[in-house]
């Protein structure tokens, strides 16, 4: 029987492991650091800290032993905070099954290197492209854990590998599509977090749907510009991993990035938001790396630039809005 190991027992790791268990094709093992969460999953079929009140598939088992989880896994799915990936991979590398395909559920760009998550995996584990896949799309973890209808994109340069993973996680409520454009799929997932911060700020300032629509649309434009400059297919960004993920993340109160931005827009400082939420949204962490990539490739990303200025340079949201709205007038067409 095919085995899928999911490393990371947070909300998304747990929800995706449950999707695979519900699909019923593979043995599914979830690894987590915290013994109390692992015990709750195994005995009560619930992750009380991250997905309280949701009953998980009893076929899903959990362990604190990463070597046990990874042993013989055909697919090793990673769902940890993006900026911890490199450190975790170094610790796990010796337990990696020689034939496993490593799958990233993470949506971020590594600070310091500006590498996508699949690039970090390739570098640390020295794996070829056909053994690395990514899964992305409009995937709010709690909705999926509640078994509400959802879609996603499985991307790998080797289409057959993507198809194999697609079959393992297809269920009555979860419909994955395949793609070979790993660059486009990953960038769509990473940049949308930054745009969601901007949308959240606008909501926090009391602005309405016109402002949100403008930020989402122009945010998509700058995402496409960067992705194409890095070798992606622009059509990927019109799909689930681009527009779909962007709309979900910018629209939902379940989105950590939108929520973070909303609190900032309502008058809180970045430090106050971090203290209240006890976490830093991934878009905050990745925004500087995304802006570095943009500048290195001569890509204009005014919304991302404004987000970085607010998050790291203390620019008040009202001034960021003024700077954005005061830019020189341009025609609306691709690449401008």
Curated annotation (Swiss-Prot):
Molecular function in Gene Ontology: glycerol-3-phosphate dehydrogenase [NAD(P)+] activity; NAD binding
Catalytic residues in the record: 192 (proton acceptor)
Top-level class of the enzyme under EC nomenclature: oxidoreductase
Pathway the protein takes part in: Membrane lipid metabolism; glycerophospholipid metabolism
GO CC list: cytosol
Subcellular location: Cytoplasm
Reactions the enzyme catalyzes: sn-glycerol 3-phosphate + NAD(+) = dihydroxyacetone phosphate + NADH + H(+); sn-glycerol 3-phosphate + NADP(+) = dihydroxyacetone phosphate + NADPH + H(+)
Family matches, as InterPro entries: 6-PGluconate_DH-like_C_sf, 6PGD_dom2, G3P_DH_NAD-dep, G3P_DH_NAD-dep_C, G3P_DH_NAD-dep_N, NAD(P)-bd_dom_sf
Keywords: Cytoplasm, Lipid biosynthesis, Lipid metabolism, NAD, NADP, Nucleotide-binding, Oxidoreductase, Phospholipid biosynthesis, Phospholipid metabolism
Amino acids binding NADPH: 11-12, 33-34, 107, 141, 256, 282
A Pfam match: NAD_Gly3P_dh_C
SUPFAM superfamilies: 6-phosphogluconate dehydrogenase C-terminal domain-like (SSF48179), NAD(P)-binding Rossmann-fold domains (SSF51735)
Main function: Catalyzes the reduction of the glycolytic intermediate dihydroxyacetone phosphate (DHAP) to sn-glycerol 3-phosphate (G3P), the key precursor for phospholipid synthesis.
Assigned protein family: Belongs to the NAD-dependent glycerol-3-phosphate dehydrogenase family.
Family annotation (NCBIfam families): PRK00094.1-2 (NF000940), PRK00094.1-4 (NF000942)
Protein name stated in the entry: Glycerol-3-phosphate dehydrogenase [NAD(P)+]
